[in-house]
Amino acid sequence: MTDTNLTRRGFLGTTVGAAALAALPKMAFAKELLRMSTLGRGTSPNLVMTTFANIINKSLPDYEIQLNATGAATRHVLEVAMGRSDFCMSSPAIHALMRNKAAMFAKIDQAPELVKKLRTVLNFPMGVYHIAVYGSSGITSIDQIKGKRVFLGPPGGAAYATMERLFKAVAGFEEGTDYEAVKLGWDAAAAAFQDGNLDVYCNPTNAPSPALTQIAVTNQIRFLGIPADKLETEAVQKLVGRPGFSAAVLPAGAYGENQLNESDVTTLGVTVGIVSNEKADEDMIYQMTKAFYAGVAEAGDSSPWLKAVTPAAAVQDINLPLHPGALRALTELGVDIPDAARA
């Protein structure tokens, strides 16, 4: 998606562009407007992709990325594949489901062809699944959520499906029978948990999450995990073994003194990424990739949740080829490019 006005990049690409540049006022050039879809506020994809947009908008004058933080990633990838949007969050798991026309893509006949139109700009750790409860709730394990109001993730999204499967794998609980899955978006769910209107709040995010850190300042919280005796079961291993997923650890002290966990919590870790359409301009993607990692390095210790967002992580768990512009940028940044990242 681009602005139909004359852009600096497009103008300079014309025969007369360079010669006429001095004769035109600066205001004659319009930025190229680009749409990027991500998850709601409080999620790590929102934080990372907001940072991406801010860095690009500040450092590359030819472009302006406008964020859309509504809807599910499963819808966003279809929009990008169809050329209706420019960038979105996706994941190795979503790519596998599209190829196999499975789960939320089961009724979308063109999904296997549409995934071929997507290209990876970069991957990054989404973080670990936080399953949060208040200390005052008395809940200390997943098998104690029966009858509770639970936010799994937005309906129809990958997070919702993952948590629904995890609760069944660990405790045998069925949504709608053993607990109530509250249907909310990310923003509304964070507010509902903060207001005490949810018993259990699930959010895949890098630790420490700003949203949960804010809650932990004035409230005792606990994070529920996968018990050791359940980790090696077939049902849990099917979750852990999905593309982009792994068993991961949420440290006991990640949220300070008000985190009640006395030991580290075993949960699910997940890799996600930013994808574009295969037809996105190569030089544009190259410039954006280089500018983003330069901006992340400049942020340093001021943004601790960005520490895991590195050039090396850009190809972690990758199962969708890199866009040629990203491939060029990451190669220049010294990243060892796996075969799966090459078209």
Please give the residue ranges for each predicted region.
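N-terminal secretory signal peptides and thylakoid transit peptides that target proteins
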Residues: 2-19
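Bilobed "Venus flytrap"/periplasmic-binding protein-like clamshell domains
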Residues: 34-59, 63-66, 127-195, 302, ...
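A structural signal for short loop-to-beta-strand junctions that line the ligand-binding cleft
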Residues: 109-124, 255-265
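Ligand/cofactor pocket segment of small-molecule handling proteins
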Residues: 164-235
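C-terminal lobe and pocket-closing loops
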Residues: 224-287, 337-341
